[in-house]
Amino acid sequence: MLLIWLLLLTIVTLNFWLRHKYDYFRSRGIPHLPPSSWSPMGNLGQLLFLRISFGDLFRQLYADPRNGQAKIVGFFIFQTPALMVRDPELIRQVLIKNFNNFLNRFESADAGDPMGALTLPLAKYHHWKESRQCMSQLFTSGRMRDVMYSQMLDVASDLEQYLNRKLGDRLERVLPLGRMCQLYTTDVTGNLFYSLNVGGLRRGRSELITKTKELFNTNPRKVLDFMSVFFLPKWTGVLKPKVFTEDYARYMRHLVDDHHEPTKGDLINQLQHFQLSRSSNHYSQHPDFVASQAGIILLAGFETSSALMGFTLYELAKAPDIQERLRSELREAFISTATLSYDTLMTLPYLKMVCLEALRLYPAAAFVNRECTSSASEGFSLQPHVDFIVPPGMPAYISILGLHRDERFWPEPCVFDPERFGPERSRHIHPMTYIPFGAGPHGCIGSRLGVLQLKLGIVHILKQYWVETCERTVSEIRFNPKSFMLESENEIYLRFCRSSL
């Protein structure tokens, strides 16, 4: 009997404690989405039980009808108060104008896991700044044009041959997009950053894919690791999460150790030169520094880039008029040449519009966050926009997926309409309502390369094939609740029909 009373007392005490915690925004007069006072998970319940994707969760928080016209909305990451920023000007304040008050991302790796803690996305400001400056030299427009493009053309040619082999003597065939797009993007990544002639499209398999997919295998430990890194950063020293699996970390270390192309100027070479130019006690001298950056570059581009290419093909298949207009533009571009130059590819207007619209519906980053690092003891004031001071340590989230599908800024937001980015309508796009790769100093380092890769892949598919929906094509995209990235929960199938330009 005593045990029952103690249990009841504990439950009631916990409930009162949670009520107090969850009263944070109400007591300050800030619009908020109150979680159940019986749940210690805050607003993360569906995510923690793998019922909703990261992107969909933050979109729901952003678009909740209870928010009305609120510029910021409070919610809870377990018991930690967090902000959802919904106003474009405040988004600009957080990501760009007042970057010095929001220097870090909220997530954090365990310091005892250097393979995770040293990576560009998880490194804290001073380490991040140096690493970013080093790695950004690989992504200049000049290098993309003069060095990368020819290598990417080779992979794009392999993509054409891959489809030719899949169809054989047939005029059309229904194919899944996932494997093809993954082979394409990992072949590009291996060639550009590790000087590896991966050849996944030629062989139909890739060790890079095998190793990377292991990171997405869902098990209780992996779920705990991801949730710890993203939502319990202060507990990582206790929970000891691993960003990479041991097998993946070992593979990346071997890849770096076996790298023997000092003249290539690839990612590994660039990072090794960075190490040589720093003192012996510099953070970059850690044995895992190069492997950690190599590992995160592959991971960041693997699912994001391949899924985006699949989504773009899916939308083109559902909109034959848009696909025909794009193919007409490509047909004209290919009249006098068998291969498009970098400059020609980058100046095709309708191709650009199609890719921009694909990135609106399926942004490379579904959400971003920044942790308030204001040196002022009370925090950073959002006045005159909102009467609220963001305290040091509080995370501010931006749902890019929510922003890009907000009917306040995008009429018929779920309709695939490249004309939004045409000469007439693009002038009316509200600043900071289109940020598919994030924005500001922490914006995606590989954004331009990602767009180039998408354009090249789409061009070399449509050059030889017409794509259309079939009986196996999903009627709508549902995002995988077991993936951190935006990827389809179900495989996307399309019919590929031989139709040279």
From Swiss-Prot:
Its EC number is 1.14.-.-. GO terms for cellular component: endoplasmic reticulum membrane. It comes from the Eukaryota. InterPro entries: Cyt_P450 (IPR001128), Cyt_P450_CS (IPR017972), Cyt_P450_E_grp-I (IPR002401), Cyt_P450_sf (IPR036396), Insect_CytP450_Detox (IPR050476). Its cofactor is heme. Its main location: endoplasmic reticulum. Keywords: Endoplasmic reticulum, Heme, Iron, Membrane, Metal-binding, Microsome, Monooxygenase, Oxidoreductase. It is an enzyme of class 1 (oxidoreductase). It is found in: Endoplasmic reticulum membrane; Microsome membrane. Heme binds at C444. It is a peripheral membrane protein. GO terms for molecular function: heme binding; iron ion binding; monooxygenase activity; oxidoreductase activity, acting on paired donors, with incorporation or reduction of molecular oxygen. May be involved in the metabolism of insect hormones and in the breakdown of synthetic insecticides. Belongs to the cytochrome P450 family. This is Probable cytochrome P450 6t3.
